[in-house]
């Protein structure tokens, strides 16, 4: 996807507790998720390098905002938007 809806109020209410580094990692992970339209593989090193963050930060964000499945890490809201797109 080249575009996805961004709801500022929802974003702020769900992420206001994050540090600047965590906030940036979350935004980059969401952007990457929409760009690839697939669950993230379970490889913290790969994801951290892709978004220029640390494995520790990526792990914190994945646990809080994504769901670990057999297919990899999924984001429910992004999956719903991607399904609407197709």
How should each PLM-predicted stretch be described?
Residues 1-86:
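Detector for short helical micro-motifs
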């Amino acid at each position: 996807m080249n575009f996805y809806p961004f709801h500022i109020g929802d974003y702020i209410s769900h992420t206001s507790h994050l540090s600047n580094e965590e906030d940036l990692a979350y935004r980059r992970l969401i952007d990457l998720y929409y760009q690839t339209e697939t669950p993230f593989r379970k490889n913290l090193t790969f994801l951290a390098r892709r978004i220029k963050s640390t494995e520790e930060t990526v792990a914190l964000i994945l646990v809080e905002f994504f769901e670990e499945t057999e297919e990899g890490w999924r984001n429910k809201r992004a999956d719903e938007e991607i399904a609407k797109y197709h």
